[in-house]
Amino acid sequence: MAVFHDEVEIEDFQYDEDSETYFYPCPCGDNFAITKEDLENGEDVATCPSCSLIIKVIYDKDQFMCGETVPAPSTNKELVKC
């Protein structure tokens, strides 16, 4: 069983469209990373390439199965329908 450093909502990650990768700052100074493809495949663990820490990504798996990108948080409370 993995020991997670933290559990982080996908909305708190930064998304890079070019690499289709979500990033979140790691305490070591690098970034945790998880690709959109990983999320579409049901993965929920983001790793840091510079240290041994891992975090659990909290996200709606159904939304990623529809091939959608989760936008940054906004004030719009309207639900997205698949």
Swiss-Prot record:
Gene Ontology CC annotation, any one: cytoplasm
UniProt cross-references to Pfam families, sorted A to Z: Zn_ribbon_CSL
Pathway it works in: Protein modification; peptidyl-diphthamide biosynthesis
Reaction equations catalysed: [3Fe-4S](1+)-[protein] + Fe(2+)-[Dph3] = [3Fe-4S](0)-[protein] + Fe(3+)-[Dph3]; 2 [3Fe-4S](0)-[protein] + 2 Fe(2+)-[Dph3] + NADH = 2 [4Fe-4S](1+)-[protein] + 2 [Dph3] + NAD(+) + H(+)
Residues annotated to bind Fe cation: C26, C28, C48, C51
Primary subcellular site in the record, as a coarse category: cytoplasm
A GO molecular-function annotation: electron transfer activity
This protein's record includes keyword Iron: yes
The keyword tRNA-binding belongs to this UniProt entry's keyword annotation: no
GO biological process: negative regulation of protein secretion; positive regulation of binding; protein histidyl modification to diphthamide; tRNA wobble base 5-methoxycarbonylmethyl-2-thiouridinylation
Keywords: Cytoplasm, Iron, Metal-binding, Nucleus
Annotated knockout phenotype: Embryonic lethal about 11.5 days after fertilization. Decreases metastasis in a mouse model of melanoma.
PROSITE patterns assigned to the protein according to its UniProt record, in alphabetical order: DPH_MB (PS51074)
UniProt note on tissues of expression: Widely expressed with highest levels in heart, liver, kidney and testis.
Residue ranges of domain DPH-type MB in the record: 4-60
Location(s), subcellular: Cytoplasm; Nucleus
Cofactor annotation: Fe(2+)
Positions in coiled-coil regions: none
Similarity-based family: Belongs to the DPH3 family.
Entry's free-text remark on domains: The DPH-type metal-binding (MB) domain can also bind zinc. However, iron is the physiological binding partner as zinc binding impairs the protein electron donor function.
Function per UniProt: Required for the first step of diphthamide biosynthesis, a post-translational modification of histidine which occurs in elongation factor 2. DPH1 and DPH2 transfer a 3-amino-3-carboxypropyl (ACP) group from S-adenosyl-L-methionine (SAM) to a histidine residue, the reaction is assisted by a reduction system comprising DPH3 and a NADH-dependent reductase. Acts as an electron donor to reduce the Fe-S cluster in DPH1-DPH2 keeping the [4Fe-4S] clusters in the active and reduced state.
Record note on quaternary structure: Component of the 2-(3-amino-3-carboxypropyl)histidine synthase complex composed of DPH1, DPH2, DPH3 and a NADH-dependent reductase. Interacts with SERGEF.
Name of the protein in question: Diphthamide biosynthesis protein 3
Annotated organism of origin: Mus musculus
GN (gene name): Dph3
